[in-house]
């Protein structure tokens, strides 16, 4: 397993991370635990999760898997939806309980997909107050955010934080062969993260299999492309031992792609990438959990997303 440094934190994280959503989808809970422990045994130390994944089942299963010494092997990340201080604090404590741990290595604000999100979180009474209090109490170590809708929303979150003299430790976003052509996080956001030494968490390397449906690239090409960017970790969902082995093979065989290889891959995917056809998380509400469940955001919050909010 290859390891990279997570931004300016100094933490060493595996080049591939285990996605938490798919862990809760597996019908057999014991199989989920086996996947998590096998990943850790093979050097994947970055564990992804979220307070809302599968009604908390993803965190519960990961919490069970991290017993018997496995917590010490993991760099554990989870996410919360709460935009206000009270909701965020409650979700942090619920995640800690489900994960059966006294601290989370990286806590991230989930689904930053509205232009109104940055002010709600970073303003007075916002969720950031809960995160900073949790950090002071030793419940969390680092703070980041995630989103999949539009790079301009990410930029607003970053610059709203900079204006308040706060720099996030990590940022998660789609980085893949299609993103490079449409509403690109790679082109707009990645340079800012590199400049400020913020950890880069790549997700949706295969677009939840949508990109594979374009029949232009293989799973290994997708993972190697994302790994060839200045990512700290490429997070991928594994709902079976077979898919986990695919991720391990990709990590084991990875060598940075040359400029000619990248150019050829992008040329191959360009026609299919137009209009975000294979990136529905950017163009539809299908991936917007907080749009469908605005109560997760906290009392009185709207689920409307970019560009409406």
Predicted feature locations:
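Short catalytic-loop micro-motif centered on adjacent basic/acidic residues
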Residues: 45-52, 77-79, 141-146, 172-173, ...
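Glycine/proline-rich, positively charged
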Residues: 83-188, 194-201
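A general structural detector for well-ordered alpha-helical segments in enzyme core domains, enriched
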Residues: 2, 31-36, 61-65, 91-95, ...
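Structured C-terminal cap/extension of enzyme domains
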Residues: 30, 38-41, 45, 164, ...
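N-terminal binding-site loop/beta-alpha segment at the start of enzyme catalytic domains
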Residues: 1-73, 130, 136, 308-309
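Conserved, mostly hydrophobic/aromatic
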Residues: 6, 18, 39, 47, ...
